[in-house]
C-alpha cells in the first residue's frame, strides 16, 4: 500500500529562495527578502506605509498566480498587505505598513507560497 503518491520530484534553491516540485504539479516555494532604507512615511489613517510596493521575486516561475502567506519583521513593528493585483507568476508585491513613521528602516519579509509547475 502506498501512503502518499504525491512525492517530491525536484527541490532546489537560488538567491530568491527555495522550491519543491511535487508529482501532482504543485510548486511550493519559500524564503525571505531583506529591504534596506525603506521609507515608511505615507500616511494611512493612523498608520504609515511605503509609497510603492515591495517586489519579492520567486525562486522559480509558476504556471499560475501564486497563493502567498507572508509576514514582515523589523524594528518598527511592520506588517504587510499583499493586494490581489500584486500576485504573479514570477514575483509578488506587498505594501509595508507600520504605526511608526520612519525614513530609513530595514525590513525582512518572510514568505511561503504555492503555485504550479505543470
Regions found by a protein language model. Name each.
Residues 1-30, 34-37:
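Glycine-rich, low-complexity segments
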Residues 26-118:
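Extracellular attachment/recognition segments
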Amino acid at each position: 500500500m502506498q501512503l502518499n503518491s504525491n512525492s517530491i520530484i525536484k527541490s532546489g534553491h537560488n538567491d530568491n529562495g527555495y522550491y519543491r516540485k511535487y508529482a501532482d504539479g504543485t510548486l511550493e516555494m519559500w524564503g525571505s527578502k531583506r529591504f534596506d532604507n525603506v521609507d515608511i512615511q505615507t500616511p494611512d489613517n493612523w498608520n504609515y506605509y511605503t509609497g510603492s510596493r515591495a517586489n519579492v521575486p520567486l525562486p522559480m516561475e509558476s504556471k499560475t498566480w501564486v497563493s502567498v502567506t507572508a509576514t514582515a519583521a523589523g524594528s518598527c513593528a511592520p506588517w504587510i498587505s499583499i493586494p490581489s493585483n500584486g500576485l504573479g507568476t514570477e514575483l509578488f508585491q506587498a505594501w509595508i505598513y507600520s504605526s511608526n513613521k520612519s525614513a530609513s528602516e530595514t525590513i525582512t519579509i518572510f514568505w511561503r507560497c504555492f503555485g504550479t509547475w505543470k
